[in-house]
């Protein structure tokens, strides 16, 4: 049965990197992949067309699709809009609407890019971490929240950090099941010494861990985890954490690899439906200049094939094509170094197609 993908170009470099990735998708379809796709706007593009960053047309298409592929959202020209209308709110809205509670962010250092990391190569060579971040709870979505005026006239900002047992259980299963396909280690990260939210988190992870006796479970405070990611990152396999801690740690881990332009991400629901996007932003400073690195988006397509279409063979085919391109010495500006060949966004896309 034909699977359907909703493709959201987004803002900034989004249309360029998505265009190169769709060329890869088209070639896979020509080779026999039974998939159809349709475009819809999200973020600033959607606001310009519909007056809302996540309009009804996009909602309906994404709800019906088996998976969603996104470029990037956000641009300075929208910074003065009311908060609910800003492009980034469209991304939050689609995660909530599709109940995408599990964010998977790999941090992989390809051997060809070992010199791109700011850390010594012996510390990061062979790095392969997966950060599993809970995406729909925690302080980003907790109520009540707001800014209020106190009796003394001073203003106070407040937010609510909270997690339910069921929210923790389902992300724990994702973390342990991911670890089973890797090196069978989960490190649960929180701040259980001062936060009741993560005290419960730790308790539930211990409970769920008993269902996965082949996976080693450890716990770490978030401040120590941030330090250990820089000191000895290869000790980690799967890091499982809440929304706000995961937001910070996944960005930190991404820079161990030298360029966030290489890193894909997946956000999944309980049935494997997912939103796939590069970890980087919309980079409006280079938008429209054919300079962007499309490889994170291409690798996001590989994750889509793996997690939503259960097509491991084609996922590996795409990942191998990316590695071959790097072995050929081709580099966009963000990963360029002396002795390699600087190429444009579309030239990188050409190279991936040629090796696919």
From Swiss-Prot:
Q: Which PROSITE patterns match?
A: IDH_IMDH (PS00470)
Q: Which residues bind Mg(2+)?
A: 223, 247, 251
Chain residues that bind NAD(+): 281-293
Q: What class of enzyme is it?
A: oxidoreductase
Keywords, in A-Z order:
Amino-acid biosynthesis, Branched-chain amino acid biosynthesis, Cytoplasm, Leucine biosynthesis, Magnesium, Manganese, Metal-binding, NAD, Oxidoreductase
Cofactor(s) needed by this chain: Mg(2+); Mn(2+)
Which InterPro entries does the record match to this protein? IsoCit/isopropylmalate_DH_CS, IsoPropMal-DH-like_dom, Isopropylmalate_DH
List the residue(s) that the UniProt entry marks as the site Important for catalysis. Answer: 140, 191
Q: Where does substrate bind?
A: 95, 105, 133, 223
**Which reaction does this chain catalyze?**
(2R,3S)-3-isopropylmalate + NAD(+) = 4-methyl-2-oxopentanoate + CO2 + NADH
Q: Which GO terms describe its molecular function?
A: 3-isopropylmalate dehydrogenase activity; magnesium ion binding; NAD binding
Under SMART domains, the record lists: Iso_dh
Name the pathway it acts in: Amino-acid biosynthesis; L-leucine biosynthesis; L-leucine from 3-methyl-2-oxobutanoate: step 3/4
Q: Which GO terms describe its cellular component?
A: cytosol
Q: Name one GO biological process term.
A: L-leucine biosynthetic process
Pfam families, alphabetically? Iso_dh
The catalytic activity of this protein is classed by the Enzyme Commission as 1.1.1.85
Cofactor note as given? Binds 1 Mg(2+) or Mn(2+) ion per subunit.
The keyword NAD belongs to this UniProt entry's keyword annotation: yes
* Family listed: Belongs to the isocitrate and isopropylmalate dehydrogenases family. LeuB type 1 subfamily.
So what does this one do? Catalyzes the oxidation of 3-carboxy-2-hydroxy-4-methylpentanoate (3-isopropylmalate) to 3-carboxy-4-methyl-2-oxopentanoate. The product decarboxylates to 4-methyl-2 oxopentanoate.
> What is the name listed in the Swiss-Prot or TrEMBL entry for this protein?
3-isopropylmalate dehydrogenase
